[in-house]
From Swiss-Prot:
It catalyses: The enzyme specifically hydrolyzes (1->4)-beta-D-galactosidic linkages in type I arabinogalactans. Involved in galactan degradation. Degrades arabinose-free galactan to galactooligosaccharides, producing galactotetraose as the main product along with galactotriose, galactobiose, and galactose. Is also able to degrade galactotetraose, galactotriose and galactobiose, suggesting an additional exo-mode of activity. May hydrolyze the beta-1,4-galactan linkages of the galactan portion of arabinogalactan type I, a pectic plant polysaccharide from which most of the arabinose has been removed. The lineage of its organism: Bacteria, Bacillati, Bacillota, Bacilli, Bacillales. Optimum temperature is 50 degrees Celsius with AZCL galactan as substrate. The gene is ganB. It comes from Bacillus subtilis (strain 168). This is Endo-beta-1,4-galactanase.
Length: 429
């Protein structure tokens, strides 16, 4: 980054008094520099963060990016396996999404990393080799499952509900067995992704709960030590999480972790996030966590495909800068830690989904996105998701929210995972 960045130098005497979002109040002096360094970050210590607190990253797109020619570096500017770089920065858990069959009838990938079980194994083995546990995130769809769509896998489309239950159980168990056989250290399994209003093509909560239990049963039978997580979103909507948690309880759904997405520009205040997660934990005895979060460090687009943030109408509670990004991540960690012992941790979503090439070479980028699935969706996804991917396919929509710059070098904000444990005051230079 060549633009000038403000650096804040906080005196130790005011360390305990300043809030993370109010770090400007602790300024001793201000200095303009050409580039922010990791040692220049101000990160207030997160109180209540135990040694097992999850500091996770979802890097599901990484294989497709590397196949597209993307190279990642360490903090010294040397080429290095990104999983080693993440580990050195304090990341201790890797999340990977799994789609049933993200390919068309000719074998062309839908994009978004083309994340099938085999990709999950590749990613999982590299994470395990670097001493990180793995969260297997089953979407139970052939492409993106989120609040707007929970499309049933093509192969399950004509099944009866009872047959679908059997297939979900079988698919989950067989996939986990494959991953474990390959040496992947799975610590947690997500049965569904952002299943706020649907799951595997079902929208009736009674049926959804039965499907949740089939996935959970498969996990329990595979390894009883693996945590079962259910994942929802929109914590800002009044009464949503209390309704979901109560419904799960009434339907006797077997799970360990109530997980939420939390994006600062969409999902309300951190105080509310803590409140709704704490209520679930205290009322139903569940562990809680944030399964997805991220924030912008620049308003610039890197690859010629538009980004999800910033957009008009969004609330951006932190500066759009490397320091603002680090503070945003730190504050989400604090929000989860503030739920008490039930708070497991936080996963950053796609911190490495950077451009496959500069936006000035967008035509070349398009070829790479189509060939390797390194964009959020390829044109081939139109047969499965014609209304969304079929119209808006293209590159990375979050390259300006990555924790690596557009050329694959780690941003100083990547160090927030380790700085949050003890806090960090920048040194003058």
């Amino acid at each position: 980054m060549k633009s000038k960045v403000k650096m804040f130098f906080a005196a130790a005497i005011v360390w305990s008094a300043c809030s993370s979002t109010g770090y400007a109040a602790a300024i001793e002096k201000e200095k303009h520099v050409s580039e922010l360094r990791a040692e220049d970050l101000f990160v207030k210590k997160v109180e209540g963060m135990n040694k097992d607190f999850i500091k996770g990253a979802d890097v599901s797109s990484v294989i497709a990016l590397e196949n597209s020619g993307v190279t990642f570096y360490n903090t010294n500017g040397k080429r290095q396996d990104i999983f080693t770089t993440l580990k050195q920065a304090g990341v201790n858990y890797v999340r990977v999404r799994i789609w049933n069959h993200p390919y068309d009838s000719n074998g062309n990938g839908y994009g978004g990393g083309n994340n099938d079980v085999q990709k999950a194994i590749e990613i999982g083995k590299r994470a395990t080799a670097n001493g990180m546990k793995v969260l297997a995130d089953f979407h139970y769809s052939d492409f993106w499952a989120d609040p707007a769509k929970q499309k049933v896998p093509k192969a399950w489309a004509n099944l009866s509900f009872e047959a679908k239950k059997a297939k979900l159980y079988e698919y989950t168990k067989q996939s986990l067995q494959k991953m474990i056989k390959e040496g992947v250290d799975i610590g947690m399994v997500q049965v569904g992704n952002e299943t706020t209003g649907g799951f595997a093509g079902e929208t009736d909560w009674t049926k959804m709960c039965q499907l949740f239990n089939e996935g959970s049963r498969a996990v329990r039978e595979t390894n009883s030590n693996i945590l079962v997580a259910l994942h929802f979103t929109n914590p800002e909507t009044a009464g949503r999480y209390s309704f979901i948690a109560e419904t799960l309880s009434k339907n006797k759904v077997d799970y360990d972790v109530f997980a939420s997405s939390y994006y600062p520009f969409w999902h309300g205040t951190l105080q509310n996030l803590t409140s709704v997660l704490k209520a679930v934990a205290n009322t139903y005895g569940k562990k809680v966590m944030v399964a997805e979060t991220s924030y912008t460090y620049t308003a610039e687009d890197g690859d010629g495909h538009g980004n999800t943030a910033p957009k008009s109408g969004q609330t951006l509670p932190y500066p759009i800068s490397v320091q603002g990004q680090a503070t945003a991540v730190r504050d989400v960690m604090e929000a989860v830690a503030n739920t008490g012992k039930a708070g497991l941790g936080v996963f950053y979503w796609e911190p490495a989904w950077i451009p496959v090439g500069p936006k000035t070479q967008i035509e070349k980028n398009k070829v790479l996105w189509e060939t390797y699935g390194s964009g959020w969706a390829s044109s081939y996804a139109a047969e499965y998701d014609p209304e969304d991917a079929g119209k808006w396919y293209g590159g990375s929509a979050v390259d300006n929210q990555a924790l690596f710059d557009f050329n694959g070098h780690p941003l100083p904000s990547l160090q927030v995972f380790q700085y949050a444990e003890s806090g960090h005051i920048p040194k003058k230079r």
